[in-house]
A protein has these predicted regions:
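Beta-sheet entry/capping signal
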Residues: 42, 169, 185, 338-339
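Short secondary-structure boundary/capping segments
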Residues: 2, 11, 60, 135-137, ...
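A short secondary-structure junction motif
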Residues: 52, 56, 257-258, 288
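Autoprocessing Asn-cyclization modules and mimics
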Residues: 107-211
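Aliphatic-rich helix starts adjacent to a transmembrane/signal segment
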Residues: 28-89, 391, 397-403
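Short linear sequence signals and composition-biased patches located at protein termini or domain-edge surfaces
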Residues: 27, 68, 75, 91-94, ...
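Short, solvent-exposed loop/turn and secondary-structure capping segments
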Residues: 55, 132-133, 350-352
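N-terminal leader/signal peptides at the extreme start of proteins
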Residues: 1-30
Length: 405
């Protein structure tokens, strides 16, 4: 009996319980407005995240572009500075007028930029053979006895053998004591260690720059003169990728705009071989300073009693002293070369919107450099300009063991 009563009480309790919300509820769900508000908040968070990522990505792309032109300009500066310091190294100082020649505002590439060019001679491999006789008809040079014994070079071909004489570019200088401003540029075709002779082919007319060498002259003027190896280099900028005489894929020419090259004369192919030093270069300018009137004092070219950057001249400028650049003493007196390299990003800055103001035109437009004018239009390409001055400090450097040059 008691057991039945307990069971009835349990059933009564169970029947009086409310169902769990899992099975049914009188509470209402989210309204449409609440759903829209929640979705809007979530969308705003997503959009803000994407906007932050996009902005960060644009900054990263722009920074990468700028870092790239910085690297290019600095690399070009390094090679150019090194070579300028070595102009005329190992060559007779009496012929220093022929060691470098500039082109101011070379217009071969066309507007809107007219960059400068610089061609110069140097000699990194020691060779100075004293001439006993010279036969211009056969281009045969006979040297004093035992001249070949002083150097490690062989009768093989260069560059297959880095110590070979054959195919090397040489310059034949007359006796420096005669003050005869002549010279012959050629490549060695044969060498005879028994007769102390070399034979060469002239390349005077093939070398793009005559460098005031004035080939020819009396054969007797060359007795006591010298024969040395030379390197003939030109630094230049291809503005538009269609430089006259350039053929894409030939001799290293890329055919792309804004490429700075160093070109070296190859006597084997009788042509310049081009090495691209830097991409995305907009302008290249050279200026010169020294004792160009041979008065044993640095020239105050703007007559302000101060020697500074304002005294540098563009190639061919007369300055306050009315220099005549056809006079040998003018190029011979150059002791410093100032060079300016302007880099330009390959693409406009994607993180920059609107039009650049006048205050930042020098950043997003081409500035004036030396005598190269500025551009009025700001094209949103970022610029990077480096300027340096190199002293031609190795001009009288002796690279031989037999005394001074």
């Amino acid at each position: 009996m008691n057991k039945l009563k307990r069971e009835e009480k349990m059933k009564a309790k169970i029947s009086n319980r409310r169902f769990s919300p899992l099975y049914g509820s009188s509470k209402r769900g989210f309204t449409v407005i609440e759903v829209l508000i929640g979705s809007s908040i979530m969308l705003a968070i997503v959009v803000a995240t994407l906007s932050l990522y996009t902005k960060s990505n644009k900054v990263s792309v722009d920074q990468q572009q700028f870092a790239d032109i910085q690297h290019n300009v600095r690399a070009a500066m390094y090679f150019l500075s090194r070579d300028i310091k070595s102009i005329g190294a190992g060559l007779p100082l009496q012929f220093s007028h022929a060691f470098l020649e500039g082109d101011n505002n070379d217009n071969s590439g066309g507007p809107p930029v007219y960059p400068d060019k610089l061609t110069f001679l140097g000699n990194s491999d020691p060779l100075r053979l004293i001439i006993q006789s010279f036969d211009p008809g056969s281009n045969t040079v006979t040297f004093e006895p035992n001249q070949f014994d002083m150097y490690p070079y062989t009768a093989t071909s260069y560059p297959a053998d880095t110590l070979g004489y054959i195919n090397r570019l040489i310059i034949v200088f007359p006796n420096p004591e005669l003050n005869v401003q002549k010279g012959e540029v050629g490549k060695i075709t044969s060498v005879n260690f028994v007769t102390n002779q070399i034979v060469f082919d002239r390349v005077n007319g093939k070398v793009p720059k005559d460098l005031n060498l004035n080939p020819g002259g009396d054969p007797d003027d060359y007795i006591g003169g010298t024969v040395t190896f030379i390197e003939l280099k030109t630094y230049w900028l291809d503005v538009d990728g269609s430089y006259p005489g350039g053929h894409v894929g030939v001799d290293g020419y890329l055919g792309e705009p804004g490429v700075m090259y160093v070109s070296q004369w190859n006597p084997i192919s009788d042509s310049y071989e081009h090495m691209a030093l830097a991409l995305n270069i907009e302008d290249l300018q050279f200026q010169y300073h020294g004792d160009m009137d041979a008065d044993q004092q640095l020239d105050d070219n703007n007559s302000d009693a101060t020697i500074d950057v304002n005294d540098f001249l563009n190639w061919g400028d007369s300055g306050d002293k009315n220099f005549n650049w056809n006079d040998d003493e003018v190029p011979a007196g150059i002791r410093s070369v100032r060079f300016l390299i302007l880099g330009k990003t390959a693409n406009p800055y994607i993180g920059f919107s609107g039009s650049p103001s006048d205050a930042v035109k020098y950043i997003y437009g081409k500035p004036a450099i030396a005598d190269s004018p500025a551009h009025d239009e700001a094209d949103k390409h970022r610029r990077f300009l480096l300027e340096s001055t190199a002293q031609i400090r190795n001009l009288s450097l002796s690279i031989y063991n037999s005394g001074t040059n």
